[in-house]
Design a protein with these regions (language model features):
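Beta-propeller fold detector
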Residues: 42-51, 85-96, 137-145, 196-202, ...
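Conserved short beta-strand element of beta-propeller blades
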Residues: 7-27, 32, 52-76, 81, ...
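Generic short beta-strand segments
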Residues: 170-172
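Beta-propeller blade signature
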Residues: 79-81, 125-137, 158, 179-194, ...
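Active-site/pore-lining binding-face segments in mid-to-C-terminal subdomains
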Residues: 182, 222-249, 260
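C-terminal single-pass membrane-anchor helix
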Residues: 1, 297-302
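Ankyrin-repeat TPLH-centered helix-turn motif and closely related helix/turn capping elements
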Residues: 263-272, 276
Length: 302
């Protein structure tokens, strides 16, 4: 690790802002800046020269968190899977390119990455696809025949708790309505491969079409969702939500990381230089509204 004094960076060369179990990380074209407390360390990043990686950045890839907060980088619409090991970029898959992943929910569970829903080949989907690190391929998951059948969608909001994933809303399209917002809450159980509908959302939400980059889990029960100048806090155990308005300086960019009970975000100036700002989660959550009911109608007792 090479210590550096620089604390302001050029956003044009920034590929990802993320973290592992120990450090915040700024991943640039040819280097990784690791941040431990207030110390900055520069490590060279080895990337094999390839035209396929010209778009290796947060606009085109989702970060999926694995064991020990490891980062997997999954192409948003094709499903290619990369990771960084010993400061080298490694491709983990042998899969062919696919256009079925746009707007999908990518979730790590028991040494696999699962893709739920998404848009590809001019239509939304409700398929579940699993990436197996042993055979390095994506394979379709067979859903139990008695499972609830969810509507096709993209850009659903998700929250993982143990063997279950909650899915909140989403959007689909048809000839008559280009953006039909779905008002449902359901779960998927990894153990029996079943969806279950929990209830119908109140029709007063504005966080549809939310990119997965704007979803930050806080604990087993709660996640934050960022949309324009509003942050939503949803409690999936109590089926309540709270919100905080007037936070455009945090919500405007998808470069946000929660690390060690602190929310870090990039403050970008007019010259596209940025500094890392932070706020303690406890201080942030103190300013949220009082809890409101999430659902209008409940089908499944929690």
């Amino acid at each position: 690790n090479k210590p550096i004094n620089q604390t302001q960076f050029d956003v044009d060369s920034l590929r990802f802002f993320t973290s592992d179990s120990n450090n915040l990380q700024l991943i640039f074209n040819n280097s990784i800046v690791k941040i431990d407390e207030d110390s900055f360390f520069l490590n060279p990043l080895s990337i094999k020269k390839s035209n396929d990686l010209n778009d290796f950045n947060s606009k085109n890839y989702l970060i999926v968190k694995g064991y020990n907060d490891n980062n997997f980088f999954v192409r948003s619409d094709m499903g290619e899977v990369f990771s960084i090991k010993k400061d080298s970029l490694i491709r983990n898959d042998f899969s062919e390119q696919s256009k079925a992943f746009a707007g999908a929910n990518m979730i790590f569970h028991q040494n696999s990455i699962y893709s739920f829903f998404g848009y590809g080949f001019f239509e939304e989907r409700n398929a579940v696809i699993q990436f197996d690190f042993e055979n390095k391929q994506w394979n379709k998951v067979i859903i139990d025949k008695d499972s609830y059948q969810p509507e096709v969608r993209r850009h659903s909001i998700h929250h993982k708790k143990g063997n279950q994933v909650y899915f909140l809303g989403g959007t689909n399209s048809n000839l008559y309505q280009p953006n039909d917002h779905l008002l449902d809450l359901m779960t998927f159980d990894f153990s029996d491969k079943k969806f279950s509908k929990i209830g119908t959302l109140k029709n007063d939400f504005t966080f549809f079409n939310n990119n997965q980059k704007n979803i930050i889990p806080l604990d087993d029960n709660r996640s934050l969702f960022f949309k324009k100048d509003i942050i939503y806090l949803v409690d999936f155990e109590l089926l309540k939500y709270r919100f905080l308005q007037g936070v455009s300086q945090i919500s405007d960019y998808h470069f946000k990381v929660v690390h060690k009970d602190t929310l870090y975000y990039l403050d970008i100036d007019q010259e596209y230089k940025f500094e890392i700002k932070n706020i303690a989660l406890l201080d942030l959550l103190e300013n949220f509204s009082e809890p409101k009911d999430l659902l209008e109608k409940v089908y499944v007792t929690q």
